[in-house]
Amino acid sequence: MQILVHCIQKKDDDFDNIKEYIKMSSKWADIKDINKFNSQIAKAQSASKEQAHKAYDLAYEHCLNGYCIGLDEKGYHLDSVEFADLLKNSSQISFFIGGAYGLSPQFKTKMNRLISLSKMTLAHKIAKLMLFEQIFRGLCINANHPYHK
């Protein structure tokens, strides 16, 4: 199984725990943390929400592989067992985290599923940490590992 996590993010300054969750998950899945950011995105984010969405869409257009899940504040709320079931859907799963303006309405229509990690707005670093922890937890649930009790 391959799990790709795509994020519009300036730097690779994530919490060290993300690397740990990727390492611990490696016995069940090949997980990649893919950050996208370039001068076009930076310029577009300064211009307008619409320009930013176009830049995000362009950065992500070649990343739509496997079962695609977008993170969105209005997405479906799952508990950990339901999230684990999502991980059973495909041999390749791609998660998408939008930039400062979220995912564009057009890009959201290309997703197989939209989920929300919280009703609250989260910083990218925190959202990513929560996502990687839930991926690890979901893989543990599916493997009957005692991490999830």
Swiss-Prot record:
This is Ribosomal RNA large subunit methyltransferase H. One of its GO terms (molecular function) is rRNA (pseudouridine-N3-)-methyltransferase activity. S-adenosyl-L-methionine binds at L71, G98, L117, S118, K119, M120, T121, L122. Keywords: Cytoplasm, Methyltransferase, rRNA processing, S-adenosyl-L-methionine, Transferase. SUPFAM superfamilies: alpha/beta knot (SSF75217). Its EC number is 2.1.1.177. InterPro entries: Alpha/beta_knot_MTases, RlmH-like, tRNA_m1G_MTases_N. HAMAP family: 23SrRNA_methyltr_H. It is found in: Cytoplasm. Homodimer. It catalyses: pseudouridine(1915) in 23S rRNA + S-adenosyl-L-methionine = N(3)-methylpseudouridine(1915) in 23S rRNA + S-adenosyl-L-homocysteine + H(+). Specifically methylates the pseudouridine at position 1915 (m3Psi1915) in 23S rRNA. Its main location: cytoplasm. Belongs to the RNA methyltransferase RlmH family. Pfam families: SPOUT_MTase.
